[in-house]
Amino acid sequence: MLFALCLMTGVLSSCGKDTSSTETTKKDDNTLVILNYGKYIDESVLDQFEKETGIKVKLEEYESPEEMYTKFSAGSINYDLVCTSDYMVERLINEDQVLEINFDDFEYYKNLDSSIIEASQIFDPENKYSMPYFYGTLGILYNTTMVSDEEVSTWNVLWDEAYKDSIIMQNSVRDSFTPALRLSGYDINTTDENQLNDALDLLIRQKPLVYAYYVDETGDEMAMGNAAMALVYSGEAAYAMELNDDLSYSVPEEGSNLWIDSWFMPKSCHNTEYAEKFLDFLCREDIGMLNFDYVYYATPNLAVKENLDEETLSDTTIFPTDVRCINNMTSTRQSYRIISGKN
């Protein structure tokens, strides 16, 4: 029997706190309820939006796209805006859970890079349902005093028994499957049941070597020297490298993927005018800069990039140029089904 990967047990350990309320949120006509990754927006941005518009913002947080889908599907909270990964945006579009965004009245949407908007057509073909927020790659953050550059040139190092109890993996099904699929020579978006099970077998074999499955804690753990390497998003790697000069980042030769986190308006949105006003606000140069400085991931906001120094712009950990990632930005449709029951 086939189940969604988010129901899989035995491969990933759950971790972290639940930052959302378990009670149904009472809708205030003057309040936007937003669901976003943890630590993924500068809260001063929310304060400034409230001050300028008089519209209140209630922020709910989650750790993984699978957790987001569970929260969203429960229906106990009527969200007005959600930020999540590209493949989950596509899933919800296909499930007819998403409203069209009217960009015609946006004043600052023009600040967004047209190439990133075009890349978003992989999961939002007409760019009608989503707005890009940040983008980046998935790779290996490693401590150069423990691991050589040559070793991290391949995903195979994540299965090296010499690093038992010193490997951090992502507590996200999609991301954990990426290295296993690439190492096996498979497309990261495969829907082939046998290929997915091959990757699952690799992850099960890897589990005894893993120090922990994290999301938000990875950068800090690596900065403190608690592990030799970690599967991370590029922005998290850049953050950790600022804290520890011994850290470096690599996209293995087998390739990875370029991801685009995006905002969408669910059908539970009670005031599309306010929601669209908030999205346009995020596109402003000053607001985009606040968010970039806080999150430190690649921003699609060209007005922000014009004000960054050359050292930052040329840092490929932040702004990826590796074609091995860009060429893997392909459709994720229905790539989350496997045989369950293995552990």
Where are the regions that the model predicts?
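A ligand-binding cleft/hinge motif common to bilobed small-molecule-binding domains
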Residues: 88-91, 223, 229-246
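A bilobed periplasmic-binding-protein/Venus flytrap-type ligand-binding module shared by bacterial periplasmic
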Residues: 139-146, 182-183, 259-271, 281-282, ...
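Periplasmic-binding protein-like
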Residues: 196-205, 211, 243-267
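Bacterial signal peptide processing site
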Residues: 16-18
